[in-house]
Regions:
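Conserved active-site-proximal phosphate/metal-binding subdomains
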Residues: 22-38, 44-192
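Active-site entrance/lid segments in N-terminal catalytic domains of soluble metabolic enzymes
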Residues: 1-36
Length: 192
């Protein structure tokens, strides 16, 4: 049968990431596959959703913005850390080991990066982070937990029900689609 769709996830996303941004990745994938492409990474509002659709995606996958959902079962401390995050508050660990992970900067992430830069072995790094996601998600340990989040964390400001998050995403995307069609940059110019 094969795959029904493919998710093209850019490096802006939280968790395990690659090097290409969503803006660069999605059109390249859309150009070479004959199945639907779902864009992921760096999508928190209707502007970004509309951009993903313009790049050739049939839809989007959102992650970081759903971490703040009232129904999301992560610890309240993790949610609070997401809500406090600013635009530059994520980092990527694990590049040297070939398993890059984007997460919020905290003492655990800074220590991991220090050890990684100092040439720590893969085993040492794995031992250091063992259980860190559990510490974040279930225990609410924002100092020693792996607070995976994408670069859009700085755009997430309040806890809302999932239905409200999705409705805002869709309604903003639809409204902007109408606005962008009349954008001056898209007007035909005489003699151009």
């Amino acid at each position: 049968q094969g795959a029904a769709a493919v998710i093209a996830e850019g490096g802006e996303s939280g968790g395990h990431v690659g090097d290409l941004t969503t803006l660069a990745l999605v059109p390249q994938v859309a150009d070479v596959v004959s199945i639907p492409v779902i864009a992921a990474g760096g999508i928190a509002d209707g502007r970004q959703m509309l951009a993903a659709l313009a790049l050739g995606a049939c839809g989007v996958q959102i992650g970081t913005t759903l971490l703040r959902a009232a129904e999301c079962p992560i610890h309240e401390n993790y949610k609070a850390a997401i809500l406090k995050a600013k635009d530059g508050d994520t980092t990527v660990t694990g590049r040297a080991a070939g398993a890059p992970v984007r997460l919020l900067k905290n003492p655990m992430a800074r220590e991991y990066l220090r050890r990684e830069k100092a040439g720590a072995s893969l085993e040492e790094l794995e031992h250091f982070t063992l259980g860190s996601l559990r510490r974040a998600v279930f225990d609410g340990d924002t100092r020693n937990g792996s607070l995976m989040a994408g670069q859009v964390a700085g755009m997430v400001h309040e806890i809302l029900p999932v239905a409200d998050i999705l409705e805002c995403l869709y309604s903003e995307c639809r409204a902007l689609a109408g606005v962008i069609s009349g954008h001056p940059a898209l007007e035909t110019r005489e003699g151009a």
